[in-house]
Amino acid sequence: DTLVRRKQICALYASSLKQKSWAILPLLSSADTESSYHLFALRIKGIQEEQRDRIMQKIFDQDVSVNVHFIPVPMMSFYKGLGYRISDYPVTLSLYENEISLPLFYDLTDDQVNTVIRALVNAVESEL
């Protein structure tokens, strides 16, 4: 089942990253809610966009693909044209600057998840 596998992958990411002081893990479940396990949107404490982009490049250089999924509305061209400025939304900007979405798909093997984790940790810790 796809959802079961996605939960397993998220659990692997979470268990491997929870002890990293720089990792801000996504909330996957609480007493009232549970994630759809569609994305694993990791945030890296204290970094800005330039650092995030360097980290992502270092991960790419290890043959792992990551992404940024949440582009703030004020950064979209239509809204820029309406006069919205990301500088008016500092919390949103901060969340955007330090977010990296890790691979999360049904066919991802445990070995591949471990490869992602190693690439991520190597990249982040070489940048901080």
Model-predicted segments: where are they?
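PLP-dependent aminotransferase class I/II
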Residues: 1-128
